[in-house]
From Swiss-Prot:
Pfam families in the record: Fucose_iso_C (PF02952), Fucose_iso_N1 (PF07881), Fucose_iso_N2 (PF07882)
Enzyme Commission number(s) of this protein: 5.3.1.25
Family statement drawn from the similarity comment of this UniProt entry: Belongs to the L-fucose isomerase family.
Residues that, per the record, bind Mn(2+): 335, 359, 525
Catalytic residues identified in the record: 335 (proton acceptor), 359 (proton acceptor)
Gene: fucI
Recorded metabolic or biological pathway in which this protein acts: Carbohydrate degradation; L-fucose degradation; L-lactaldehyde and glycerone phosphate from L-fucose: step 1/3
The entry's keywords: Carbohydrate metabolism, Cytoplasm, Fucose metabolism, Isomerase, Manganese, Metal-binding
Mitochondrion recorded as keyword: no
Entries under HAMAP family matching the protein: Fucose_iso
One cellular component term from this protein's GO annotations in UniProt: cytoplasm
Swiss-Prot/TrEMBL GO biological process terms: D-arabinose catabolic process; L-fucose catabolic process
Transmembrane segments: none
Name of the molecule in the record: L-fucose isomerase
Length: 588
């Protein structure tokens, strides 16, 4: 059984015996326990289990104790460390020198013992050795007997832990390409060096004929298929057929295609993670899957010109339920856009919520909207907005039909209930695919995302000579008047899922205007997640040594390793590039 990645907590202490160390043992170990309790009571793994922490077997005052801690952590699948101390310790003697995992240090802000002095000293050692570490120091002085973790310290500890866990969850997993390059899209030209060196992942690939092989040879669970077909007939609404008359398929052919796309979903899932039922059916090799944390399906054009498209498969893999009930989503990229798949993966591992995959299709200016509809934009839409619309698939959680405190949300599967599942299905239909684009047919996904949801749009790009670069845009979904929505939506494909998005503007750089956001976006796709998580993404990017070329996150929320400040404190964007370039990828 594969262990969850864990956070290692290292209580460091002044090594002087005969009074000094003894007086600090309880306080120091209590700091470690309080950090472990904070993380385990607040954060969850993608499967819903509480995050696990491992505390060093003793406080660490000298090198042998640091070594003992290191050995324990190696056996315990520790993916990151947090060192805590209320006092002076011996910097390079007590530090964790693992170069391939993130490190953070919390130095207690008190007056009796110099925790801040140790923090500064050990961070200097980390900087000299080229092993980045995050420094955490509370704003306000605390009493020596105060066991509470201040709110500003909590925020940094949790931000660090979320990002560090993401690095651990990615390590030693795989990206699975189903097919190859779709329509010349750069993101589907999969770069194995990027996955290996930056994420610690491997790449696997299967030809799309694997789907037809498994269908023809019955390499799927026939009992599940019958159950799935019954559920789809009862719960999934076939939408209006927008095709011109000569392209409309017969009822008999549409029914056959429903069976086909259900099998596509089952096979796509089994390819990613395996299925023990296949071994019972005599297919032991296929039963193990590909250990894929994220995958993509080429589809266009070789598959979709002949077979039903992948929209149903992609939609339900990214959705948190199917005929087997509520479950965690799979991260799955349209058109095998591996870079958008990784963007979705970053978002998912930080939030445990499903992701919207979308084309960044159109910038609508206030003037253009008024010209086309006669409507004057107001509120969050006043400066214009972006039309996010994928060519036929999207997680049903993207409807915004789940709620929290009466507001639309996208939330982890363990918070979802059956009434929210039904609301998503009721507010979605599946029209026959546009056969001018998808000659083989299939069924697309059509819904409108509810407005007023805080969301973050993300994209990872590869820049020749630099490597991966991340861009982040926080903003809100919009709810337009119904007639305005229909007028604008019908100018594209009315059978596809739509999200209206207004990025938060800052008045400078790429966020001077909504047009500038669109104009600076690095690719045709974006990954959209619930919540404003830009600060967490920046922290994660720094751990992976991926520079961020545009974002609208407030400066006070940016949390990177301490040595980033030695690359410059005025132009943080340039300093980020220099730090990432000098340090190189995390797993190289």
């Amino acid at each position: 059984m594969i262990q969850h990645p864990r956070i290692g907590i290292r209580p460091t202490i002044d090594g002087r015996r005969q009074g000094v160390r003894e007086s600090l043992e309880v306080q120091t170990m209590n700091m470690a326990k309080s950090v472990a309790d904070l993380i385990s009571s607040t954060l969850k793994y993608p499967d819903g289990e509480p995050v696990e922490c491992v505390i060093s077997p003793s406080t660490i005052g000298r090198v042998p104790e640091a070594a003992a801690s290191h050995e324990l952590f190696k056996k315990s699948n520790v993916c990151a460390t947090i060192t805590v101390t209320p006092c002076w310790c011996y910097g390079s003697e007590t530090m964790d020198m693992s170069p391939d995992i993130p490190h953070a240090i919390w130095g207690f802000n008190g007056t009796e013992r110099p925790g801040a002095v140790y923090l500064a000293a050990v961070l200097a050692s980390h900087t000299q050795k080229g092993i980045p570490a995050f420094g955490i120091y509370g704003r306000d002085v605390q009493e020596a007997n105060d066991t509470a973790i201040p709110e500003d310290v909590k925020e940094k500890l949790l931000r660090y832990a979320r990002a560090a866990l993401a690095t651990g969850l990615m390590r030693d997993t795989a990206y699975l390409s189903m097919g190859s390059v779709s329509m010349g899209i750069g993101g589907s030209i999969v770069n194995p060096d990027f996955f290996q060196e930056y994420l610690g992942m491997r790449n696997e690939s299967v030809d799309m004929t694997e789907f037809t092989r498994r269908m023809d040879r019955g390499i799927y669970d026939p009992e599940e298929f019958e159950r799935a077909l019954k559920w789809v007939k009862e719960n999934v609404k076939e939408g209006f057929d927008h095709n011109r008359e000569d392209l409309v398929l017969s009822r008999e052919e549409k029914d056959r295609q429903w069976e086909f796309v259900i099998k596509m979903f089952m096979i796509g899932r089994d390819l990613m993670v395996g299925n023990p039922r296949l071994a019972e059916l005599g297919f032991e090799e296929e039963a193990v899957g590909h250990h894929a944390l994220v995958a993509g399906f080429q589809g266009q054009r070789q598959w979709t010109d002949h077979f039903p498209n992948g929209d149903f498969m992609e939609t339900f893999l990214n959705t948190q339920f199917d005929w087997n009930g509520i479950r965690k989503p799979f991260v799955f990229a349209t058109e095998n856009d591996s870079l958008n798949g990784v963007s979705m993966l970053f978002n998912y591992l930080l939030t445990n919520t499903p992701q919207i995959f979308a084309d960044v299709r159109t910038y609508w200016s206030p003037e253009a909207v008024e010209r086309v509809t006669g409507y004057t934009l107001e509120g969050r839409a006043a400066a214009g907005f972006l039309h996010l619309i994928n060519s036929g698939s999207c997680t049903l959680d993207g409807t915004g039909q789940a709620t929290r405190d009466g507001k639309p949300v996208m939330k982890p599967f363990w918070e979802l209930d059956e009434s929210e599942v039904q609301a998503m299905l009721e507010n979605t239909d599946f029209p026959p695919a546009n056969r001018e684009y998808f000659r083989g047919g299939g069924f697309s996904t059509r819904f409108l995302t509810k407005g007023d949801m805080p969301v973050t749009m993300v994209r990872l790009n590869l820049l020749k000579g630099v490597g991966p670069v991340l861009q982040i845009a926080e903003g809100y979904t919009l709810e337009l008047p119904e007639d305005v929505h229909h007028t604008l939506d019908n100018r594209t494909d009315p059978g596809w899922p739509t999200t209206w998005f207004a990025p938060r503007l800052t008045g400078k750089g790429a966020f001077k205007s909504v047009y500038d956001v669109m104009n600076n976006w690095g690719a045709n796709h974006g990954a959209i997640t619930y919540g404003h998580i830009g600060a967490d993404l920046i922290t994660l990017a720094s751990m992976l040594r991926i520079p961020v070329n545009m974002h609208n996150v407030p400066e006070e929320d940016i949390f990177r390793p301490k040595n980033w400040s030695l690359f410059g404190t005025e132009d943080l964007e340039s300093a980020d590039y220099r730090a990432c370039q000098l340090l190189g990828p995390l797993h190289k």
